[in-house]
Amino acid sequence: MRSALFICAFLACLALTSSRAANAKASDPPNVPNIGFVLYTKSYAPGTLNARWMYGNAYSGPGIATGGQTIGFAGRYHVRYFYDSGEFSDEYDLVIEKNKDSYKASWIAKGKVAAIGVGMEVENGLAIGWRRVAD
């Protein structure tokens, strides 16, 4: 009787541990480097940019930045990103500043800079490499 109870308790603990481990793997893949890339292209809507982004080798999807200037890429935007599945990912206030032939970008959430990047214009767009800022 004791051994049957012990086996049931052991299997219950094993099942609980396995499900927690699976959830951790699904939400945060191991070895994801803190580096991303985004390509912004002009939308037909004035002051709007379409985005195609990726983070490390684990996440990617589309996005849309609104509220910017009608000419060029520099300006202040509100950007929303989505996963390839269509599920919402993140949203930020995005500041893009031009300096000669290069650009500096800052993604701001809740009044704090969450990510920074640098980029340059490419054919039909603005390419930016970025990383999350450590707390």
Pin down the residues of each PLM region:
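Positively charged n-region of N-terminal signal peptides that target proteins for export
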Residues: M1-A4
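Bacterial N-terminal signal peptides
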Residues: I7-A15
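Central antiparallel beta-sheet cores of small beta-barrel/beta-sandwich binding domains
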Residues: A22-D135
